[in-house]
Amino acid sequence: MTVVTENTRIQSVLPVSTPAQVKAELPISARAAETTLQARKAIQDILSGQDDRLLVVVGPCSIHDTAAALDYAGRLAGLRERLSRDLLIVMRVYFEKPRTTVGWKGLINDPNLDGTFDMQTGLRRARAFLLEVGNLGLPAG
């Protein structure tokens, strides 16, 4: 009698898109690219002491409701503009729950919050969200 001990807890195996595939499906806009480039330069200048503004990274623990998070981003973008002389505001965007051992694992792993672990959808939803935030002129990190 042969006893199977390998892969006994695997229910199915599905392919996951490569980063290049997701980027091709959801390309970055000129506005989002410029937001990213300018923010990286400004952060570098702050950290090296060439810019005396305070770098402020704010945002939710982890995103599960992209519509609510986009509303938050819109409000934060307005604050970013008003306070730009003194602060560089970056939205904290986190999609996973790294310290969670039970329950929901995060937007990328389980975007539908139903235990289906549709990572294909999760990866695309996360990228689309980041692109929308970048299009608001708000850097994300």
Identify the residue ranges that each predicted region occupies.
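Catalytic cores of large soluble enzymes that bind and process phosphate-bearing ligands
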Residues: L14, I28-T35, H64, A68, ...
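N-terminal catalytic cores of peptidoglycan-degrading enzymes
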Residues: M1-R9
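A generic short-segment signal for beta-strand/edge and adjacent turn/coil regions
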Residues: V22-I28, V57-P60, N109-N112
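Generic N-terminal targeting/processing segments that precede catalytic cores or assembly contacts
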Residues: T35-R53, H64, A68-R82
